[in-house]
């Protein structure tokens, strides 16, 4: 009798302590949640769509995780070992098994349909009026090639830059990506762009900047001992600043190409 009273009192104390802890921690957890889910700044047109899918998945899995853990703790407490209590066994509940099989399947189908729309925007709706840039990754740098005044690639007036990608704000950019040596991963976190650069294969991706600024280009694939230093920079310019930068690059390249000839004539 005494042990039963003590057990009941301990149960009440534990429930009260857990309730108090939950009430105290709930505001802190709710306040911290946005920081846990915080992603890099959005600077491309489709970044909000990508983040929307990510946040939806995080909320769904987060709620399911909390519910499952609470049920688990409840069962651990309710069916804990007690003196004189005989364990009972059950085959299961077919109705519950059907529910928790169908419900996750429906959630997966919903997420697949929503993700399909975002995937179509990024991978299948390549803009026609876009700036074309060729990108080649190598250990351990990014090489960018712009068409020159003739508007064609692989001609003498092509503009080449190392680890520097520029384009105007509000204009779509189509990148043709490949690699010179090993697999690299072209990663622009703020643009929500991440695509492998594979030797012998050309992959096309696109994005459009929504604000002027300067961000880092990372390689997100371990590509050798110098992987840590393989980074470049992407600069989104105003249209006027972009044209000025492009003209400066063309002039510098032309001057550099002419320098050996001038030296030879002298």
Residue ranges and their predicted role:
Residues 1-34:
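N-terminal secretory/membrane targeting signals
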Residues 30-56, 76-266:
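Non-transmembrane, membrane-proximal soluble domains of secreted or membrane proteins
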């Amino acid at each position: 009798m005494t042990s039963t009273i003590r057990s009941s009192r301990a149960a009440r104390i534990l429930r009260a302590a857990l309730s108090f802890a939950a009430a105290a921690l709930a505001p802190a957890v709710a306040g911290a949640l946005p920081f846990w889910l915080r992603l890099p700044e959005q600077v491309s047109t489709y970044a909000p769509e990508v983040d929307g899918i990510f946040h939806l998945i995080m909320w769904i899995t987060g709620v399911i995780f909390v519910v499952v853990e609470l049920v688990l703790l409840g069962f651990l407490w309710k069916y804990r070992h007690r003196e004189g209590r005989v364990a009972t066994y059950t085959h299961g509940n077919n109705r519950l098994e059907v529910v928790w099989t169908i419900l996750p399947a429906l959630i997966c189908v919903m997420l697949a349909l929503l993700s399909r729309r975002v995937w179509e925007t990024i991978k299948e709706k390549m803009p026609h009026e876009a700036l074309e840039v060729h990108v080649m990754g190598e250990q351990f740098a990014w090489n960018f090639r712009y068409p020159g005044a003739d508007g064609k690639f692989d001609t003498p007036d092509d503009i080449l830059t190392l680890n520097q990608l520029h384009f105007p704000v509000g204009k779509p950019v189509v990148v043709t990506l490949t690699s010179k040596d090993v697999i690299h991963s072209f990663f622009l976190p703020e643009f929500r762009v991440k695509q492998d650069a594979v030797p012998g294969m050309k992959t096309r991706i696109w994005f459009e900047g929504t604000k002027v600024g300067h961000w880092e280009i990372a390689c997100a694939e371990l590509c050798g001992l110098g992987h840590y230093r393989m980074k470049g920079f992407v600069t989104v310019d105003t249209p006027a600043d972009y044209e000025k930068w492009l003209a400066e690059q063309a002039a510098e390249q032309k001057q550099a190409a002419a320098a050996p000839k001038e030296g030879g004539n002298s």
